[in-house]
Amino acid sequence: MFSWIRLLGALLLLASVAHAQFQFFEHMFGGGGGGGGHQGRQQAAQNVPSDSSRYQSQWDSAHCDKYLCPGTLACVHFPHHCPCPHPDVEEKVELGEGSAVCVSKGGYKEGEAARKIELARKGLL
C-alpha cells in the first residue's frame, strides 16, 4: 500500500513539473500553437498605425510664429536650434552653416561624436 502512495506521489510530482515546464515555454515564446492566440491579438492592439494622421494633427494644432521643428515639434528661432528627439541617446552637432544633425552617442565620451563628424567632414576618417 505504501509503495502505491509513493508511486502516485512521484507521478503527481512529475506531472506538475512537466506542466510548469510547458507553461514556461508557452509564456516565453508567446503560446506556440494554439495557446498564444489571445496574447497575439492583445499585442497587435498595442501597435501604432503606420499612417501619419496623428503626427499631422499634432503639427496642425501646434502654435509657433517662428520655426517648428519637424522631429520634435519644438518652436525655435532657427532650424539648427531644434533639439534632438531622443536627447538621452543622441547628441546634437551643429555643422556650422546653419544646420545641425543628431547623432547617436554610441557610448562615446561627451563631444566624441562631434569630433568624429568633424574628422569625417575633413576626409580624415
UniProtKB/Swiss-Prot annotation:
Keywords: Signal. Residues 40-54 have a biased composition (Polar residues). The keyword Signal applies. Residues 1-20 form the signal peptide. InterPro entries: LCL2 (IPR034543). The keyword Ribosomal protein does not apply. One of its GO terms (biological process) is ERAD pathway. Residues 35-54 are annotated as: Disordered. It comes from the Eukaryota. Probable component of the endoplasmic reticulum-associated degradation (ERAD) pathway. Belongs to the LCL2 family. PANTHER family: LONG CHRONOLOGICAL LIFESPAN PROTEIN 2 (PTHR38425:SF1). This is Long chronological lifespan protein 2.
